[in-house]
């Protein structure tokens, strides 16, 4: 038995994302006064009282037909079809607007159980005839921001969804447990959402030629070769100097937070847009956060065959030159829209995830260390004593992190550390993941 699904529907800025966050087990949606912040349907585990369910937030819809509007309607329609119950939301402050009437008719034609949720009711509220004209038999007044009215909402939900079919508190959720969290990041319009849609074979995310369609991180649980994967689509990251509006700043912050929580990050690059400093900045940020990284060059089908070899040579040169701290990053060339080479990306993610989790025994580490340091000795210091690295151990994985003991660690140069790291990558087959060294002074400086 699976959890019942509740979908939030309404025009822009009625408070759907605020209620989504209020009912979610953890906050997931960006909230902003600007209408239309939500553009994809978002899923989360929700809870109200003892009742647990799957909650879907949908884009705000209005009456203006255009390419973007049609795609938003498609996202909302899919969420309605999935729903066991619809919470149709309106704004008590603005009252019933023409868009509310149009959307209520749109929702009712699907004959789904529904509740009219009148939001932003910070004071006592009386329903007038305009609310009844929307055609819903259940109406609740709440304030999602302040959490008032949720007990009444709970009672209505239970009345609409029989308890024995709805409450799943003692049933294991197959989505929960260990999973590989993959964040898809990159500059705007690189094809991140198109790539995820191609992988899961569903128009789950809004796509189009407009840059910046995705405004917040969207999580999708998925299975690939018996591996539980959480795919996370993110808003495109631009240079700080070009981010001016507060909403875009929120989106950028949301993306950066998603990277911090990722296991692996796919850096999506547009083959038609030259590799820019911002791409390298994103990659450096991923590495500094200790995440594993796979670089994907999208729209490869649009590059002329005669230019592909030169493109790849220059691309590898730029990556190896500007990201020497993670030599061997997997680079794949794909066409998301044509589904070309997209599964190779997931295979690369699974492989680098294993490397990111790699544990090396202390005996093997020190056998390697003795051989490597003897092959390239550190210079003699004043007094004729040589700086030595005598012993090492792995202290953690994700990323692989090592503690090295030296008689004089402050004299170990960055270039010597790079020598050790690069040699370790080759010796233990660890390409493309951050490797961290910390040095500790031994008690006896003459050892």
UniProtKB/Swiss-Prot annotation:
UniProt superkingdom: Bacteria
PROSITE patterns registered for this protein in UniProt: G_ENGA
Molecular-function GO terms, alphabetical: GTP binding
Database matches in InterPro entries: G_ENGA, GTP-bd, GTPase_Der, KH_dom-like, KH_dom-like_a/b, P-loop_NTPase, Small_GTP-bd
Protein's GO biological process: ribosome biogenesis
Residue sites binding GTP 2 per the record: 186-193, 233-237, 298-301
Binding residues annotated for GTP 1, in chain numbering: 10-17, 57-61, 119-122
Coiled-coil portions: none
Ranges for domain KH-like: 358-443
Domain named EngA-type G: residues: 4-165, 180-357
Keywords noted in UniProt: GTP-binding, Nucleotide-binding, Repeat, Ribosome biogenesis
Subunit structure: Associates with the 50S ribosomal subunit.
Physiological role: GTPase that plays an essential role in the late steps of ribosome biogenesis.
Homology family: Belongs to the TRAFAC class TrmE-Era-EngA-EngB-Septin-like GTPase superfamily. EngA (Der) GTPase family.
The name this protein goes by in its record: GTPase Der
Taxonomy of the source species: Bacteria, Pseudomonadati, Pseudomonadota, Alphaproteobacteria, Rickettsiales
């Amino acid at each position: 038995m699976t959890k019942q699904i509740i979908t939030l529907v309404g025009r822009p800025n009625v408070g759907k994302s605020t209620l989504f966050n209020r009912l979610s087990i953890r906050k997931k949606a960006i909230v902003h006064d600007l209408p239309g912040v939500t553009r994809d349907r978002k899923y989360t585990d929700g809870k109200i009282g003892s009742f647990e369910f799957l909650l879907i937030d949908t884009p705000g819809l209005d009456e203006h037909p255009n390419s973007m509007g049609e795609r938003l309607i498609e996202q909302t329609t899919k969420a309605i079809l999935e729903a066991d119950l619809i919470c149709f939301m309106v704004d008590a402050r603005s009252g019933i607007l023409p868009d509310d009437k149009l959307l209520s008719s749109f929702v009712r034609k699907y004959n789904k159980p529904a509740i009219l949720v009148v939001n932003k009711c910070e004071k006592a509220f009386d329903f007038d005839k305009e609310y009844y004209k929307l055609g819903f038999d259940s109406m609740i007044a709440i304030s999602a921001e302040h959490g008032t009215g949720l007990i009444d909402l709970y009672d209505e939900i239970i009345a609409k969804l029989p308890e024995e079919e709805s409450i799943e508190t003692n049933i294991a959720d197959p989505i929960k447990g260990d999973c590989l969290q993959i964040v898809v990041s990159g500059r705007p319009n690189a094809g991140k959402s198109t790539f995820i849609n191609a992988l899961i074979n569903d128009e789950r995310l809004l796509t189009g030629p407009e840059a910046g369609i995705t405004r917040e991180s969207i999580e999708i649980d998925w299975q690939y070769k018996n591996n539980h994967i959480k795919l996370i689509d993110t808003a495109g990251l631009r240079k700080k100097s070009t981010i001016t509006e507060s909403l875009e700043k929120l989106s950028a912050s949301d993306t950066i937070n998603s990277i911090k929580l990722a296991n692996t990050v796919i850096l999506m690059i547009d083959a038609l847009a030259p590799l820019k400093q911002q791409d390298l900045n994103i990659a450096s940020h991923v590495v500094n956060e200790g995440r594993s990284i796979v670089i994907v060059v999208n729209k490869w089908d649009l590059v002329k065959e005669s230019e592909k070899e030169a493109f790849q040579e220059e691309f590898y040169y730029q990556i190896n030159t500007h990201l020497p701290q993670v030599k061997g990053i997997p680079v794949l060339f794909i066409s998301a829209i044509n589904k070309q080479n997209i599964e190779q990306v997931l295979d690369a993610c699974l492989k680098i995830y294993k490397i990111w989790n790699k544990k090396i025994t202390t005996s093997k580490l020190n056998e390697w260390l003795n051989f490597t340091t003897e092959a390239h000795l550190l210079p003699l210091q004043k007094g004729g004593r040589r700086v030595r690295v005598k012993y090492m151990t792995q202290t953690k994985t994700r990323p692989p992190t090592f503690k090295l003991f030296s008689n004089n660690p402050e004299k170990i140069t960055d270039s010597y550390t790079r020598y050790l790291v690069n040699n370790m990558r080759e010796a233990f087959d660890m390409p493309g993941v951050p490797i961290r060294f910390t040095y500790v002074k031994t008690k006896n400086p003459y050892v």
